[in-house]
């Protein structure tokens, strides 16, 4: 199943990786150079990053599991007490296997992997897939967390969970966090998310995720939603966990959409 073609500026600022190498990598994922795009995928010496060239103050979007907010969250966050950990059913020694079907920048998946869950990632947008792949490859080399991530966090080479076979590719939990339109002028829309949303947009076909998720999940499907969003597929969950700005809708076992 090929990605639909994405046009974006491709730029190399790296002394080691050439523009030709970046173009070749992107071509494998149906990403082509479009010099008129306000978005750019940039290869630096350190990482692959996404920039919105007409709004440089927004900064670059990239995946970093080793430093920054993820390091702080791993060392000082709530761990098993985090809302996402409770939502997927981590309790005592129970560590469910998880498919994160809307991986994005991998943050919730990283939290679960750091606790000890085996997490498989699926990402539908090819640019985000490459950012995630780049971040994982760098993190796998890290002395402190590389071995743990190689064991617990893997990016699957599929675009949609409907490509997975429920008879062999199942997991205890399927986690869904589809992009949802933010309220107009919301102060909560971070700079990084504005760049991300310009690339990805709202997940208009998010409802199509629920049925294959229910078929793959042995124990539960967890759907993260803004507190003002309707239920995915219009389907009432068995129960919900509410946080300050979000809720986790939980569908148990063999529910059907």
UniProtKB/Swiss-Prot annotation:
GO molecular function, one term: 16S rRNA (guanine(1516)-N(2))-methyltransferase activity
Protein's UniProt keywords contain Methyltransferase: yes
Catalytic activity: guanosine(1516) in 16S rRNA + S-adenosyl-L-methionine = N(2)-methylguanosine(1516) in 16S rRNA + S-adenosyl-L-homocysteine + H(+)
SUPFAM superfamilies according to UniProt: S-adenosyl-L-methionine-dependent methyltransferases
A Pfam family it matches: SAM_MT
Binding locations of S-adenosyl-L-methionine: 107-108, 123-124, 177
GO (cellular component) term, any one: cytoplasm
GO terms under biological process: rRNA base methylation
Keyword tags: Cytoplasm, Methyltransferase, rRNA processing, S-adenosyl-L-methionine, Transferase
Enzyme Commission number(s) of this protein: 2.1.1.242
Role description: Specifically methylates the guanosine in position 1516 of 16S rRNA.
Recorded family membership: Belongs to the methyltransferase superfamily. RsmJ family.
Identification of the protein by name: Ribosomal RNA small subunit methyltransferase J
């Amino acid at each position: 199943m090929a990605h639909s073609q994405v046009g974006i500026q491709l730029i190399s600022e790296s002394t080691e990786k050439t523009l030709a190498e970046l173009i070749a990598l992107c071509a494998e994922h149906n990403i082509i150079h479009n010099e008129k795009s306000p978005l750019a995928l940039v290869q630096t010496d350190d990482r692959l990053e996404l920039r919105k060239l007409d709004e440089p103050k927004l900064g670059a979007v990239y995946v970093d599991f080793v430093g920054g907010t993820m390091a702080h969250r791993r060392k000082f966050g709530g761990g098993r007490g985090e809302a996402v950990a409770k939502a997927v059913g981590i309790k005592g020694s129970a560590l469910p296997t998880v498919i994160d079907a809307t991986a994005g920048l991998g943050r919730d998946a990283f939290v679960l992997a750091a606790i000890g869950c085996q997490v498989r990632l699926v990402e539908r947008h090819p640019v985000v897939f490459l950012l995630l792949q780049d971040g994982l490859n760098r993190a796998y080399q890290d002395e402190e967390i590389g071995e743990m991530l190689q064991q617990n966090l893997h990016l699957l080479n599929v675009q949609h969970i409907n490509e997975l076979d429920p008879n062999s590719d199942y997991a205890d939990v399927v986690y869904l966090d589809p992009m949802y339109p933010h309220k107009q002028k919301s102060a909560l829309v971070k700079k990084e998310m504005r760049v991300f949303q310009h690339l990805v947009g709202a997940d208009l076909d998010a409802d199509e995720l629920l049925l294959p998720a229910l078929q793959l999940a042995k124990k539960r499907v967890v759907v993260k939603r803004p507190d003002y969003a309707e239920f995915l597929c219009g389907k009432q969950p068995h129960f919900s966990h509410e946080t300050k700005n979000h809720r986790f809708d939980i569908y148990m076992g063999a529910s059907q959409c």
